[in-house]
Swiss-Prot record:
Protein name from the UniProt record: Uncharacterized gene 6.5 protein
One Pfam family linked to the record: T7-like_Y65
Lineage: Viruses, Duplodnaviria, Heunggongvirae, Uroviricota, Caudoviricetes
Amino acid sequence: MLQPINHVLTHPDDIPSMPRAAKEYLQVRFNQAYVMESGEYRALRAAGYSESFIAGVMHGLYLASRTLDEIEVRKEQLRQE
């Protein structure tokens, strides 16, 4: 197992700090509206990717965005404990 993965699994409360600007930028880039407006969706279609593949990409972006939200919530919970 990769060491960074092992570290997160064995130390789930060791959450790195992330500047708000970086989080907001990533939230935008992981947003479906951004993917549609930026032309990335059309580029995937033009490249011949299937609708199910593109749906998987979109779901992956959704999960990445949720992870950013969960980091913020968990850090707040740890501060309150």
